[in-house]
Structures are given as C-alpha cells and as structure tokens.
C-alpha cells in the first residue's frame, strides 16, 4: 500500500467527513481513492485522529475496518490513543486498545497515555490503560522525569494515586527538581490536598519521605507553608518524624517563610510544635522577625515577639528587625515594636553606622521618618561615610523627606568623608527640585569637595540639564576647575552631552580651559577622544581649540620672546666684554707705568754705580800709570805705549769680568753704596752680593761685547816681545800679552820712580783733559745702554709676569713659606732675565752693525748659542764658549763703525722685537694681527701678553667661540625636544585608549 500524500489541507474531504461523522461520504471517498484513508494534514493528523477528537465512533470503526493505521503518530509524536486518553473518551480508548494500540508509545516529550489519563477525574481510562500496560511500564518517566504518580499528585487526584499505588507505582522517584510526589501533593493550595498527602503517607509513612529535600533543600513542609495550606501543615507536623525547622539552601526554615508571607496561624502552629529554644537565622543572619517586620505583618510580629525564644537580633550587616521595618516603610510594625518595647534603641547603628532614620530616608518613607522624628531619633547621626539621613534623601531625590528632615533640625552645611555636601549628591542624582530646596536653605552652589569638584561638575557629568540650569541660575561658576584642572565643560564634552555644552557656553563657560595633567587636554580634546561629532562641530563654531593648536600659538610667542631675550643677552655679554677689556686695558696701563717707574729707578741706580766704578778706576789708573812710566824707562818708549794701550783695554774689560779685576774690594764697597741708594728709592731687589753676581752673569753672557772690548788696539800687529798664555780658568778667551823684563839694580829703579813721580805731576793736567773726553763718550754709551735695557725690559715684562702667574697657580696648595720662597725666586728670575735680555740685545746689536763680525763664524755661533739658551736649552758653559766652538775660523776683525753709531742702528732695529728673537726674525717682525690672520698662534707668541692683541681681534675670537657653543647647544636642545615629543606622543596614544574604554565601561568613574 502506497503511503498517503503529505501536507494535505485541513479542509480535505476525508478529514472533514471523519470529524463531522459523515460515514457515507467517508466510505465513498475511501472507495474512490483508498490512499486517502491515512492522509495527513499540516499537523500530521490522520482521519482516524479526527474521528477520535470528534468522538465519532462509527467513523473510527469504518476507518479501522478499511485498514487505517492505529499507531500512526502526528507531528508531535502522539497517536490516536494519546488523544483518546487526553480527552477521556473511554469508548474510543477501548476500541483502539482492542485494535492493538500501543499504550507505551511516547510522544516527543516522552509522555505516554498513562500520564495523560491522570488529568481527568474519571479513573476508568487509567484503569483500562493500566490493564494493557506491561508491569514495568507503570512508572514511565517523561522528559521531566515525572511518572504518572507525579501527575496524579500535581492534579490532586487521590483516587488515581491509590490506583497507581495499587499497581505498584514507586512514591519515592524524584523528578528533575528533586521532588517526589509528596512534594507536589503538599504544595497544592486546595485544602483537599491533605487527602492526597494522606494517601501517599499511608502507602509509606517513613521519616525519609516526610523530610525529603528537593534540589533547593525544601521539604514537603516548606512547600505546604509556602502555599499557606494550614491543613497540610497540620497533617505533616502531626507525624513524629517530621522536622519542624529544616533548613533549605538559603538556611531558611518553614517559620521564615511563614513570617515572610504573613501566615500568622501557620507561624503560631510552627512555634508551638518547635521544641528548640532558639530561633535560627538564615544565610543573611535574618530571623523570622526580620521577615515579618519587612512584610509589614504586625500580627505575625506580635506573635513572634510574644514567644519567649524570639528576640530582635541583628543580621550579618548589623541591622535589626526595627531597621528592616523602617527601610520598607512598615509603619504598623514600627508602631507595634515601639509599643511592645518602650526602651527600644531607635538610634542603634548597623555595621556601616546607619540608623533606622538612614534606612527610611534612603527609601523615601516619609511617614516612617515622621514617626522616627517623634521618637527621639538623632537627625544628624552620621555613618562611616559621614552621611546623615539628609545625604541619603538628597541622593535619591525625596523632596518631602528632605523638607521634613530640614524642619526636624537637619544641617545642610555638613560634608561627608570626600568633602561632598548634600548639594553634590543631589546634583549627581539629577534632582533639580532638591537642588532648589537646598539652595533656598543657604547652601553654597560653588562648594567644592576634596577633589575640587563642584555640584555643577557633578550634574554635567550626568548631563542633567535641569539641575545645571538651577545651579547656574543661582550664580554657580561654570569655570571652576578641580584638582586636575577640569571644568564642567570637560565632563559634558567627554560624555557627549550637546545640550549641556550649549547651556554651559550660554553661561559664559571658557571653551579653551586646559587641565593640569601632563596631556593638558581642553574640552575639545575630550570631545575628539570620544568621537562626539555634534559636540566637536559646536565647539569649533564657538572658538574652541585643541591642545595642539594652543601649543602652536604659544610656541610662536615663546620664540618671539626668546629671540628678544637672546638679543638682550648678547648685548649684555658684549657690554660685559667691553667693560672687561677696559678694565684689562687700565690694569695693563697701570702695570706699564709701574714698570717704567721701576726701570727709571734701576737706571738711576746703574748711573750711580757707574760713577762709583769710574772713581775707583781713575784711582787705579793713576797707580798703574806710574808703573807704566817706570816700565817705559826700563824697556823703551814703544813698550810703554803698548802698555798704555793695554791699560785702556783692561779698563774696558773691568765691566765684563769682575772676577779678574784687581780692585774687587773697591767693587764691593761700590755695591754697598748702590744698595743704600736703592733702599732709599724703595726698589731693593737683592743683596749687594747678588748685584755683583748679576753683573758677572751679564758680562759672561754677552759674547759680542766681550769680543769688541778684547779687540786689539794695535790691529793685527803683535809685538815681538808678546807670547800667548792660555788660562782655562779665566773667562776671557783672547790671548794675553806678557813681556819678559830684564833685571836691573834697585837703586836705578828708585831714582827712576822719583823722576816719574815728578813727570806725573806735570802730565796730570794733560791726562785729565784726555780722560774728560773719554768720560763724555762713556756717559753717552751708558745712556744708550740704559735705553736699550728699558726697551728690552718692556717687551719681556709681559712674559715674565705670565710666568709668575703660572708659577703661583701651580703652587696654590703649597705651604706659606714655600710661597714666599717661590715669589722671591721668581723676583730674582725676573731681574736676571731682564739683565740677560739687555745683554743679549747689546750682543746682537754689535753683530748687526759690524759687517765683518756678521760674516765671522764665531759671531754666528755665539748668536745661535744665545738663542738656544733663551729658548730653554742648556746655556753655554765656560768650556763651551762661542770662541772655542769656532776655533777653526779666522781671527776677529776690528769694528769699522763707532759704538754710538752701532747702538743707534740697534735701537732702531729692536724697537718692537722681543729679546729672544734672532737676527732673521728681527728683520721681518711678526705682528699679532698677522698671527690672527694665519689662524693659529706661533709657539713663540703663545706667552705674549693679551694687551698686545688688538681689541677687534679679541672680539672676533670671542664671537667665533660663542657661535660654536650656541650651535652645539641648539643641536642638543633640538634632539632633547624631539625625544620628549616622541615619548609624550606614545604615552598619549596609549592613555587615550585606556581612558576612553574606562569611561565607557564605568560611567560613574568620576564619583
């Protein structure tokens, strides 16, 4: 047989005939088309099912006779037997069972025909199905694990329960909620449910069934109390094994549920059957009294308080039943408790310091607040947050409670732990009317908390326009900043409240106020971070700037100010430099004048010394002349003239080699007289012995002058009676002429001496005239020599002073005695260098002005030795004299020019040349400007005085050095700015994401 067509319409003729009972039409349709006998509609139902639903027994019999499938399921999995059991049609049910219908067939929810047969009062269907049901299928469970016995208890079918129990149904099978049939029977509100409970308990009156707990920990007694079925409660508590105070998963007993639901008789019944002296508390520490007070059940509260074991104990939060009643507005319970206990602690605090008045104010229970104020409650009691009842009422916006509290003496100027006033909490809640009430009670609209936030900022954070308008109408300042520099406009832009932004700008809020954090954000920056396009557009139209734009403007102004500062600083530095130069110039001039005065004193001392020496020399010459006259008498006139010339020659050598003079004792006396003159003039430099030593050094270190004074007055002629006597101990390297006299008798010698004495007296006047002209030439020579020394001393003075300073700097940490000794040595060194320099100049003058001597190798050698000695090399010793170094050269030639002419030419050559510069350098002297143009100082000019460098050259060097340092500083500053900007950009980028996500996920972050 082919399967019937699927998806037929409900209005198919065969199905219509089956439901209406038109058997004739049904048979015709079956005869014409046999496949329509099991045709399904959209619900999957066949004509047989429709005949069962329509209670058409004849049609059902005809369909079954023509071969209709009795166990064909519909879309829900149910067969015709399910429909017959559901409707309670006993006749059709019997017909189907006779045609071998399956009574154990389950639909999609695992429901069998046995489950469905318990829905009706008639037990015939159940009995018929149980007759055809196999023994193990009586307790078949549906998807909720419920058996037919569960269904019978739920529908309160005591006869069905007895029938199922008789057929062996198990009363202890739990369903998906852990409930057994006794739970469903006890939880029924019908008073006749006690009969069903009795039927179940008669089947198995065990203690385990009485105290069976479902998956929520509830026993049948919990469910009976919860439904308020007093008969079932009395029945259950009548059994000895029943636990009157079992705990559920919330640690609540049946008494808790009775008090919570206000079942006073059941509560009284449970208290009577409870043998425990203590009333247990639940998981929150609440007793049945708490729940009775919360539910405003004064009778239950009265019953509970009348029991000896019930007391008003605090829960885990420290709240009593009285606080619970005040918080819920249970005025009758509050009055009842105050009536039953006149000494009740109305100001008792909970764990957080809150009182019953706090609880009533928070929930806005105006009647309860008035009752509490009438019973000696403290109106300004504070909790741990320093909140009074007024704070709670302002936060929730209960105007009547606020007015009642203020009339009851509540203070409006108190602040909490965070420095917030009641106006802050009213603004955070957006309660404009409450703000108006508080302002009318003289509260400050610009009050700031400990973070610097005002009520206006709190209202702007939530975007409460009405509250903001009330505050600003009462002269609240919109430009007040908190500790982070944020204003109300910052908060409105951050949360994107366009109306709040418009209102703030309308009340003259500054749009470019920067915060005090590192980012220095403006309100526009917050709008940009939040991506609020409308707020951004409106802010830009009203002149708002971002921090980047403000920094650009500030940078341009800072640069202008910095440029002006640089100009002023450069001018000040130039001015300081010029003033310093002027001070240096004046100091140099003062030092120069001091040096000139010192040189003048030395020249005067030198002239006095020369006069004393000339006086001694004249006395010696007179004695020597007598001896020469005697020698002429002995050896002849020519020998006498030669001795005269030798005497004149030796007279000149007395200034060069004082150790070989015969009158050294007279020189010591002369030195003492010179020292006395210096002491009177105040320029004593050293002892008389040191003067003699210095003069000897000058004589030894002037080879040119020695060579001139040693030149033979006879030219190249040498007398025959002369011989060479080389004495290595003497400084003079010229060969000494000595004669070999013949021995005569003493009488002849005495007579001749007497004659010579007479002749000497006659010649004295002639010799004085000749000596006068010689002294005139000597005095002019000494004046030229003094001028040369002064010129050389002025050049070397700067170098000597520089060396003195360097010596003193290197010895700052030495002892006091070492400093004195070092300064004395430096003074002697300076005096020696000056005298040495003047001697060296005189030697070079002789070399320059004598053409023959310049060509002589010995002169060149002496000049080189002198330069090497000046430049720091080892000086020439007596064994290394210039003459010995040049022994292979020709003999010295006499000078062709006079001494006066030589000194004049030398003074012109050495006007601007230091004493240690050689002949070649003296011809083309170096100048400081030439050195500066070359770009570096020569080693010979490193110790030159700063005064010799022109002012323009010094300023040029200073400017170059300053420009180099400024360029380095600008590069370093630019690198630092770039690094700092990059770090700031990275920090900003990461903080923006964090802040934005934090503010979006936590809208109350500000509070």
UniProtKB/Swiss-Prot annotation:
Protein localization: Cytoplasm; Cytoplasm, Cytoskeleton
Renumbered ranges of motif D-box 1: 486-494
Domain IQ: start-end pairs: 551-580, 971-1000
UniProt feature, compositional bias: Low complexity: 702-712
GO molecular function ontology, one term from the record: calmodulin binding
Short motif (D-box 2): ranges: 964-972
Basic residues compositional bias, start-end: 772-784
Keywords per UniProt: ANK repeat, Calmodulin-binding, Cytoplasm, Cytoskeleton, Developmental protein, Repeat, Wnt signaling pathway
Domain of life: Eukaryota
Biased composition, class Polar residues, residue ranges: 684-701, 727-745, 870-893
Quaternary structure (record): Interacts with apc2. Binds calmodulin.
Domain notes: The D-box (destruction box) mediate the interaction with APC proteins, and may act as a recognition signal for degradation via the ubiquitin-proteasome pathway.
UniProt protein name: Inversin-A
Source lineage: Eukaryota, Metazoa, Chordata, Craniata, Vertebrata
Gene: invs-a
